Amino acid sequence: MASFNATEFLKNLSSSAGVYRMYDAKGEVIYVGKAKDLKKRLSSYFRANLGNIKTQALVSHITNIDVTLTHSETDALLLENDYIKQYMPKYNVLLRDDKSYPYLFLSGHKHPRLAYHRGPQREKGRYFGPYPNGGAVRESLNLLQKLFPIRQCDDLYYKARTRPCLQYQLGRCSAPCVNKVTDEDYAEQVQLASLFLQGKDQQVVTNLVTKMEQAAEEFHYEQAAAYRDQITALRKVAEQQEVSLDKGDMDVIGVHYEKAIACFHMLFIRSGKIFGSRSYYPSVPAQTDIDEVLSAFISQFYLNADVQRTLPNEVILSQSFSDKAELESAIAEALEKKFIIKTQVRGERASFLRLALTNATNAVTTRLADKNTQEQRFSLLEEALELGHSIGRMECFDISHTMGESTVASCVVFNREGPHKADYRRYNISGITGGDDYAAMEQAINRRFDKIDTNGKVPDIVFIDGGLGQLRIAQGIVDEKCAHLDRPPLLIGVTKGEGRKAGLETFVFGGSEQQFNLPSDSGAFHLILHIRDESHRFAITGHRNKRQKTRNTSSLESIAGVGPKRRKALLQHLGGLQEVKGASVAELTKVPGISLEMAQTIHDALRGG
């Protein structure tokens, strides 16, 4: 039991609004909270009878509490959100969603381009979104290309064009770069695309019908036919899209919480169109009540800077929670805009809410089933290895290269819930003889265990995907680096079976080098192969990316006079390394910054001339 003098602490505590941080014996922040009245709120933690098991566990670890006074509840809400993101305390509900949201961007250029955008919105233009994921944006871009012939190329490529590209030939771009379309006609298509993205499909069709009739009256039959085809395509799309009768913006959130797993399934509706859906799984400490889960998710999600820009008119939530009114008010004040959470809705909204709730419920049911399977596999592995303790964390290392080129080592991490991708690591291996897997493994293991401590990142088991030599090297390093630990990691080598056939793998204990096998139909065997295969996938993906980057860079930048700037111009103008290699001297001279002499040098170097 941690020692903390609550009576002395509470004696001089202010009753103002503010934020508190609770620390454990290691000096780590284990909980962050806000309060309208700090004294009243913190006193509740130290009552004689604490009903909540989670609160009992939290209080038993407190050794210190820091408080920060704020001017208002709104300031406290904002500061609490900042502290939670900064410290990621173990007893807080955590929305682990640090990726920004993708948008569809229509630039402010003379000839605007449509593009995928993620990150700060610095460039002048219009942003449509947020979309739930990158796939939804790319799908929309693909659709828009078929409906409106607007360019999607970047400005450098656009400026360098001297003839239409393939997109023009496919009818997906009107080639404003080489004046194949008038500024007025291009601007008209941009305006129609903008209306379409705002959900004003009928207005777009009406405008096109007027244009078609006008073109026909003026005997411009080819133009009239083009408008007719565009109208037909739009109507087909409209039939396929799910559209809300309400043309406003709203987020519909279905929530299901069971056995410490919470799923928030969100439907993003903007301008009456369903942009897509996305499920969120916040990290929830055991025995956390549903009110805290709901309040934490709503505040963390809607105070995300990326979401604030496109806050919907209303949020529809499948169930209410105790401080809903206070949170609504604080978020509205913080964001300086109207913010309403509705839990009682009818008609179309109720239908959307049922859909979101069904998805959330199914997601949690699936996760619980997976969790039970995963838990069973861990138990079977513990039993097979006769460990005498539970496995909390496993790591697996693999090496990938092509004939010694672009060597990459991977380290993947599994816990009892499966792959823990936030802790995955890749190591770019350098300074070794190409193809020396022993040296590569030595470098990777050294880097992983160089500063090993007891902060929860110590693996119980480390799998080495390789032969006995690599296992011996890894074991020697771990013995040295982890000598101070009470329970250093157990190392196990995973070697291919006879004929390198799957299902015939052999396992070797590090140190004793004793071999053992597991039945190929056992859960323990499947768990080891799962982490081994994931390590292999992660290593080979990193290796391929590194190899491609190296080849693209080295083959051009090894040419005298070609640096990063010219390499980028060549690749962007001609479309890739193979196109650069196949280009004539005349074609190379059309690239900005490439003189005739430089073009000849590049041509000769790549052709071996």
UniProtKB/Swiss-Prot annotation:
The primary location reported for this protein is cytoplasm
A GO MF annotation of the entry reads: excinuclease ABC activity
User: Residue limits of the GIY-YIG domain?
Assistant: 15-93
The domain of life is Bacteria
Q: Does the keyword Isomerase apply?
A: no
Write out the entry's keywords from A to Z: Cytoplasm, DNA damage, DNA excision, DNA repair, Excision nuclease, SOS response
- What's a single GO CC term here? cytoplasm
What InterPro entries has UniProt attached to this entry? GIY-YIG_endonuc, GIY-YIG_endonuc_sf, GIY-YIG_UvrC_Cho, Hlx-hairpin-Hlx_DNA-bd_motif, RuvA_2-like, UVR_dom, UVR_dom_sf, UvrABC_protein_C
Under the heading SMART domains, the entry gives:
GIYc (SM00465), HhH1 (SM00278)
Q: Where in the cell is it found?
A: Cytoplasm
Please provide the Gene Ontology terms (biological process) for this protein.
nucleotide-excision repair; SOS response
**Pfam families, per the entry:** GIY-YIG (PF01541), HHH_5 (PF14520), UVR (PF02151), UvrC_RNaseH (PF22920), UvrC_RNaseH_dom (PF08459)
UniProt keyword rRNA-binding, yes or no? no
Q: Where is the UVR domain?
A: 202-237
User: In which family does this protein belong, per the annotation?
Assistant: Belongs to the UvrC family.
* Annotated NCBIfam families: PRK00558.1-5, uvrC
Q: What binding partners and quaternary form does the record give?
A: Interacts with UvrB in an incision complex.
Purpose: The UvrABC repair system catalyzes the recognition and processing of DNA lesions. UvrC both incises the 5' and 3' sides of the lesion. The N-terminal half is responsible for the 3' incision and the C-terminal half is responsible for the 5' incision.
What is the protein's given name? Answer: UvrABC system protein C
Native source species: Shewanella denitrificans (strain OS217 / ATCC BAA-1090 / DSM 15013)
Which gene is this protein's source?
A: uvrC
